[in-house]
């Protein structure tokens, strides 16, 4: 197995909302690992834009908000699809479909007394009214963040339009698009340096006391040969103690309530007691393994 086949959490992947400046009621939803480059593509500065943003009369487009910190590209694409199809998405919290203006819904509703024998395409249009305001889209984002599936991912929202910034509507960060960078913070870089040093100098798991090169026996030999270089290990950002990621998960599950979720939100260090985001620890584990395989 080549190192490129090993999963690594992306540095950045976001789902963005664009608004047309000449036509403020026109929006576009997409996903990207590079929002700055993607916006230039939508506005025609670079090639490979999108079919729906190609019309010169709708340009320029501006990015009004982006949801990020997804654990994988697949998770971002699922969020993008749900935001594009809020009326039919199973991830919409509350089960009531999307939040759309009453007037918009009324326009698309069938007229009383008319036959229901319409074409499938028309039925699809009637079932999914298009949101025509930035606040409506952000309400749908808020509902997705409350869903059981997305709520445990530790997603973040950055809003670039001050007129849409409302903490009561959606907990988010307000920032200018020019100042926004998809790169992780310097704190994450420092964490990687600490984790890398700990992984290279520590030989045993602090929870099970086994060697850090432990790999479950049920894995095929071909996979063992690769993973033995460095398995998924967790490093505490506070005290740099290390353990197997699976041992940390098992420890959390044993200390949790009977009806606890399968994936933790936060975990506690067995040595210093510091609370750490599970996403942060798990993402770092994939990066450490990639580092070992590429060294």
UniProtKB/Swiss-Prot annotation:
Any one Pfam family match given in the protein's UniProt record, by short name: GIY-YIG
Key words, A-Z: DNA damage, DNA recombination, DNA repair, Endonuclease, Hydrolase, Metal-binding, Nuclease, Nucleus, Zinc, Zinc-finger
ZnF segments: SLX1-type: 205-272
Intrachain S-S bonds: none
Gene Ontology terms for molecular function: 5'-flap endonuclease activity; crossover junction DNA endonuclease activity; zinc ion binding
GO BP terms in the entry: DNA-templated DNA replication; double-strand break repair via homologous recombination
Region of interest called Disordered, as start-end residue ranges on this chain: 85-133
Lineage per the UniProt record: Eukaryota, Fungi, Dikarya, Ascomycota, Saccharomycotina
Keyword Nuclease on entry: yes
Localization per Swiss-Prot or TrEMBL: Nucleus
Keyword Metal-binding part of the UniProt annotation: yes
Subunit structure: Forms a heterodimer with SLX4.
Family membership: Belongs to the SLX1 family.
EC class (word): hydrolase
Entry EC no(s): 3.1.-.-
PROSITE patterns, sorted: GIY_YIG
GO cellular component: Slx1-Slx4 complex
Function: Catalytic subunit of the SLX1-SLX4 structure-specific endonuclease that resolves DNA secondary structures generated during DNA repair and recombination. Has endonuclease activity towards branched DNA substrates, introducing single-strand cuts in duplex DNA close to junctions with ss-DNA.
Cofactor(s) named in the record: a divalent metal cation
InterPro entries per the UniProt record, alphabetical: GIY-YIG_endonuc, GIY-YIG_endonuc_sf, Slx1, SLX1_endonuclease, Znf_RING/FYVE/PHD
Domain GIY-YIG: 11-93
Record's protein name: Structure-specific endonuclease subunit SLX1
Lineage: superkingdom: Eukaryota
């Amino acid at each position: 197995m080549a190192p490129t086949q090993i999963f690594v959490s992306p540095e950045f992947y976001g789902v963005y909302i664009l608004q047309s400046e000449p036509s403020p009621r026109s929006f576009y939803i997409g996903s990207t690992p590079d929002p700055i480059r993607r916006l230039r593509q939508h506005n025609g500065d670079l090639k490979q834009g999108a079919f729906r943003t190609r019309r010169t009369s709708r340009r320029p487009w501006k990015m009004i908000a982006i949801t990020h910190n997804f654990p994988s590209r697949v998770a971002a694409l699922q969020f993008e699809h749900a935001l594009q199809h809020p009326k039919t998405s199973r991830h919409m919290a509350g089960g009531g479909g999307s939040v759309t203006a009453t007037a918009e819904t009324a326009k698309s509703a069938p007229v009383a007394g008319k036959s229901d024998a319409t074409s499938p395409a028309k039925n699809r249009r009637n079932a999914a009214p298009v949101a025509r305001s930035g606040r409506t889209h952000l309400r749908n984002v808020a509902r997705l963040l409350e869903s059981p599936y997305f709520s445990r991912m530790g997603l973040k929202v950055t809003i670039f339009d001050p007129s849409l910034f409302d903490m009561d509507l959606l907990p988010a960060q307000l920032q200018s698009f020019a100042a926004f960078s998809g790169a992780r913070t310097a704190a994450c870089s420092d964490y990687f340096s600490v984790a890398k040093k700990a992984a290279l100098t520590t030989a045993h798991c602090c929870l099970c006391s086994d060697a850090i090169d432990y790999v479950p026996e049920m894995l095929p030999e071909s996979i063992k040969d690769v993973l033995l270089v460095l398995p998924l290990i967790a490093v505490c950002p506070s005290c740099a103690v290390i353990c197997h990621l699976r041992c940390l998960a098992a420890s959390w599950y044993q200390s949790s309530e009977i009806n606890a979720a399968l994936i933790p939100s936060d975990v506690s260090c067995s040595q210093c007691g510091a609370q750490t985001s599970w996403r942060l620890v798990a993402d770092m584990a994939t990066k450490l393994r990639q580092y070992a395989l590429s060294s």
